[in-house]
Curated annotation (Swiss-Prot):
Alphabetical UniProt keywords: Cell membrane, Endoplasmic reticulum, FAD, Flavoprotein, FMN, Lipid biosynthesis, Lipid metabolism, Membrane, Mitochondrion, Mitochondrion outer membrane, NADP, Oxidoreductase, Steroid biosynthesis, Steroid metabolism, Sterol biosynthesis, Sterol metabolism, Transmembrane, Transmembrane helix
Catalytic activity: 2 oxidized [cytochrome P450] + NADPH = 2 reduced [cytochrome P450] + NADP(+) + H(+)
Gene name in the database record: NCP1
Domain Flavodoxin-like: start-end pairs: 60-204
GO MF annotation terms: flavin adenine dinucleotide binding; FMN binding; NADP binding; NADPH-hemoprotein reductase activity
Residue intervals on the Lumenal side: 1-5
Protein name: NADPH--cytochrome P450 reductase
Cofactor: FAD; FMN
Amino acid sequence: MALDKLDLYVIIVLAVAVAAYFAKNQFLDQPQDTGFLSNDTAGGNSRDILETLKKNNKNTLLLFGSQTGTAEDYANKLSREIHSRFGLKTMVADFADYDWDNFGDIPNDILVFFIVATYGEGEPTDNADEFHTWLTDEADTLSTLRYTVFGLGNSTYEFYNAIGRKFDRLLEEKGGERFADYGEGDDGTGTLDEDFLTWKDNVFDTLKNDLNFEERELKYEPNVKLTERDDLTVDDSEVSLGEPNKKYIQSEEIDLTKGPFDHTHPYLAKISKTRELFASKERNCVHVEFDVSESNLKYTTGDHLAVWPSNSDENIAKFIKCFGLDDKINTVFELKALDSTYQIPFPNPITYGAVVRHHLEISGPVSRQFFLAIAGFAPDEETKKTFTRIGNDKQEFANKITRKKLNVADALLFASNGRPWSDVPFEFIIENVPHLQPRYYSISSSSLSEKQTINITAVVEVEEEADGRAVTGVVTNLLKNIEIEQNKTGEKPVVHYDLSGPRNKFNKFKLPVHVRRSNFKLPKNTTTPVILIGPGTGVAPLRGFVRERVQQVKNGVNVGKTVLFYGCRNEHDDFLYKQEWSEYASVLGENFEMFTAFSRQDPSKKVYVQDKIAENSKVVNDLLNEGAIIYVCGDASRMARDVQSTIAKIVAKHREIQEDKAVELVKSWKVQNRYQEDVW
């Protein structure tokens, strides 16, 4: 009988959890509107999707929901290949650029592709949020829609590919016809590109065999025409030298301190302070403070800061050598779209050097589909054969390219034995090399105590490969360069950057940034206890939470218990913000407790945060009984799963229930936002 009651209890809890989820988590502090998304349609097109399709005579629509640029890149590449192989008139569209009132009127002679990523805890990407709301709550019949969906996700997350699966289900439920099978890719297993290629091949088979489209010989057809401008130089004011957008080129005429600031328009923030938190032979970590006092850029504790990157001098030199662009660095060119729906990806006219430094992802891994696409431009027949062979062999590509972490230039020069690829059109490079995207960091400051300053905490990424190459993080090494220069440490950086920026706009020590809202928030009720779990830089937003509660106490506000579980390798080497925690404890008193785990301090015993959680299970259970909210930040692949498993075991033990029931109960807390994660 007791088990029957327990089953009923779990069912009730899950029902309440679902209700809480759709109530938009009213008991939590809601993120402020920071103006992340712009409502302006890129390229000046109508926001009427049906009108745009008809006006431009398109019969294939590819919609992307992208947070880091991968889904957008896939949509663009798929569009080009569908057009080239089958002659379909394709159009790539950002969800954020259109309204959806008449989406159900799209006729059945138009094929619609959805390339959508899942972000955070099963949420749509920022640009797909409005469409997600429309599809979920407002869409009626979609009986004339012919669609297919590819979802991008990470299986280390609880809600793996939730948005792709949801879109596919809802589109069918509302009457849509799936013309090709749903597909999904898993970044957690490192097979995202391969999963996409497999799905793409299946779609092409469907287009040929079921829809009877005739396949043509694949050839490169540019969407843009490049014209060099001999009448312009780098000294001309209209020429872009890497500015984020045209507003920055016209900066003397426009007030750049006013938002909204978003993924199309950042704020150029001064870096007021940097300091090294630790340094070791393997890695180091920097603390960076951005001054936003001269702008209307706002954030709330728990949000993310997007930092806009540029490429290192070393990777630029290698890329320039690879494509034989040495004598074109300062040459100005202009792009003209050959398709009225194609969006030029950066301001122009612009220089070759500015594109390579500020707009292309030249430091990241190269994909197999890029290998196959560029093979036709190989410098000789032997290299073409090598490229085609490697590109068509998944295992050989994995062994020779992926596992060695070769970027575009590394891979091309490796396959050609150092011969430059001078015949590759720069239009091809612009269309096929992914574009640089902002990198996102959990904010480690409190908007209550630091209203005009945004802090981030970043581990500087440098990996030494067997062949002597250094694989470096783009933004983290840029921040390290700034820390070295700002503090005049005399340290030699692994790679070097142009810190002055286009037209010296980044002097002294400025970078483009914007804020991305997050649901990772402290409870509205300040007396609610919280359990914070964050090893390594996962402690960053949790530091912000603790600082928030410290400020609340200073303001005379009552706060609940705050328990922090923190882990690092060694107490003396990489203990982040070590001196600060005792200061916070002196203010919070009995309402603050910290447990530390050191994984490499004792050679005979590795201790992780989940071990400390288990060791203090009574503390955890008592707080949960008092309504505590759990916050986990850090590695999704192992730590977050191990922590969740440990919490479930604690619940099972102290509440005397079966572990599978405890697992379901903990999952229900996630839906209620009683168990929140900010993981990567």
